[in-house]
């Protein structure tokens, strides 16, 4: 690599880091390499090229143009190649050959039911979903050869449906003739019942057992003893696909071993491949998700607003998406272009039906009243000393700051001696649990609240 090429690539990395979320930078950019620049074209190597190329084309084209003009005073375009061309070509050739063999059969085309907006490129990755993302990409790259079935489980609103659709969309991009179907378990049940009534079970079997990729969402819906032959039909469908090395991906709200009403033979098969868990996103991932989601809205979201929202919704992505819709309504009503913390807080209050907050309570006032009650100073509450009485006062003050103000977790942490948001969240959860079990502490906190109000 020449000196100017190195300068160009360093500038591409620098601009990328400043313009996309940290999780996206780590996943899509960090492993990329500049191979050469030839005829004003930057040759960039990527792993998982079919998925990552799309992200680069959609998000980083302007970065390459900017770096090109800065370093070479010329318009530089990009050509993306796999960092393991031989492996990619062999894998794709084998998959294409296999798919062509299947598609020589006189099987009717089907609607995949996929939502094209869900891709790997716009899925925000964090520690809580990293294994699920990696496994999903591996399955999409080589359907039927690894992790079959792939079983993704976790609570609602954590991205399971997004990953199912991303897998299906990538497989269809790689091979448009592949027979891919996304369906919820509930709709599978409905189709089964409908075909029973119409005496057309052969049509159902043809539809499901000739797929290349079956994506079943919320498989726990199948775990009902009252459904008669539904589990039997799904068992036979599973066996037919698995025997022919066709990929199956399932999602559930619980571990396969906890699907108590499913037949044991089905549960056993769900564990043949790879069960992976997705847990609620941490604060940093929620910030990254919001940074990604707000691109869909025509407003300016300052960083403190993003952090405030990330602190308010800590269970799942669906809540964050719902909050953004509420904020959009409030912003339109106010003709606002910038979403301040006040606008966000008003929208959240409306969403939660909490009504207006009459008084804005300073965190310092909470610290003063808590300190007076427990006989410690505000300085001690903010410091690092960890005697039992000071720790309790500090955690109660953090709890009340979270309960009685609209401040984000990072803002509260800053007011307590620059503590991390996770420390505030730990204190809040600890006191919340203690209040539920300790009537004396509950009375103490109500007494302090009355002094603050």
Curated annotation (Swiss-Prot):
Subcellular location: Cytoplasm
CDD domains found in the cross-reference section: AAA, Bac_DnaA_C
Region listing for Domain IV, binds dsDNA, in residue ranges: 332-453
Gene Ontology BP terms: DNA replication initiation; regulation of DNA replication
Chief location of this protein within or outside the cell: cytoplasm
GO cellular component: cytoplasm; plasma membrane
Chain spans, region Domain I, interacts with DnaA modulators: 1-78
Positions that bind ATP: 157, 159-161
SUPFAM superfamilies assigned: P-loop containing nucleoside triphosphate hydrolases, TrpR-like
Matching HAMAP family: DnaA_bact
Subunit structure: Oligomerizes as a right-handed, spiral filament on DNA at oriC.
Notes on the domains: Domain I is involved in oligomerization and binding regulators, domain II is flexibile and of varying length in different bacteria, domain III forms the AAA+ region, while domain IV binds dsDNA.
NCBIfam families xrefs: DnaA
Name recorded for this polypeptide: Chromosomal replication initiator protein DnaA
Taxonomic source organism: Streptococcus agalactiae serotype V (strain ATCC BAA-611 / 2603 V/R)
Record gene name: dnaA
């Amino acid at each position: 690599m020449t000196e100017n090429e190195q300068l160009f690539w360093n500038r591409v990395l620098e601009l990328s880091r400043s313009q996309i979320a940290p999780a996206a930078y780590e996943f899509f950019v960090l492993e990329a390499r500049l191979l050469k620049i030839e005829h004003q074209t930057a040759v960039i190597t990527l792993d998982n090229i079919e998925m990552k190329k799309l992200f680069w084309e959609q998000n980083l084209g302007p970065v390459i143009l900017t770096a090109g003009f800065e370093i070479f005073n010329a318009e530089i375009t990009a050509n993306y190649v796999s960092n393991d061309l031989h492996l990619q070509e062999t894998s794709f050739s084998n998959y294409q050959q296999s798919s062509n063999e299947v598609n020589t059969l006189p099987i009717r085309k089907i609607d995949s039911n996929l939502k094209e907006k869900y891709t790997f490129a716009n899925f925000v990755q964090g520690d809580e979903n990293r294994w699920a993302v990696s496994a999903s990409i591996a399955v999409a790259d080589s359907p039927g050869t690894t992790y079959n079935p792939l079983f993704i489980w976790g609570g609602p609103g954590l991205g399971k449906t997004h990953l199912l659709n991303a897998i299906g969309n990538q497989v269809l991009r790689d091979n448009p003739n592949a027979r891919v179907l996304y369906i919820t378990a509930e709709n599978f049940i409905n189709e089964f019942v409908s075909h029973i009534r119409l005496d057309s079970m052969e049509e159902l079997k043809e539809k499901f057992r000739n797929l290349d990729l079956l994506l079943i969402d919320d498989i726990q819906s199948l775990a009902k003893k009252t459904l008669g032959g539904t589990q039997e039909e799904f068992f036979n469908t599973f066996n037919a696909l698995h025997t022919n090395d066709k990929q199956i991906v399932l999602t559930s709200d619980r571990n396969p071993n906890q699907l108590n009403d499913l037949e044991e033979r089905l549960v056993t098969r769900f564990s043949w491949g790879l069960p992976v868990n997705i847990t609620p996103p941490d604060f940093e991932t929620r910030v990254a998700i919001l940074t990604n989601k707000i691109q869909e809205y025509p407003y300016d979201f300052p960083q403190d607003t993003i952090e405030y929202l990330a602190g308010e919704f800590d269970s799942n992505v669906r809540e964050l998406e719902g909050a953004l819709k509420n904020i959009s309504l409030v912003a339109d009503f106010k003709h606002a272009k910038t979403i301040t913390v006040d606008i966000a807080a008003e929208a959240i209050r409306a969403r939660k039906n909490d009504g207006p907050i009459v008084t804005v309570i300073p965190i310092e006032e909470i610290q003063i009243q808590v300190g007076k009650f427990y006989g410690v100073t505000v300085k001690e509450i903010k410091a690092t000393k960890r005697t039992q009485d000071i720790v309790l006062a500090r955690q109660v003050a953090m709890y009340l700051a979270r309960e009685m103000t609209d401040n984000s977790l990072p803002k509260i942490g800053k007011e307590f001696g620059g503590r991390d948001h996770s420390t505030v969240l730990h204190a809040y959860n600890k006191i919340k649990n203690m209040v539920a079990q300790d009537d004396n502490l509950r009375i103490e906190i109500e007494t302090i609240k009355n002094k603050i109000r």
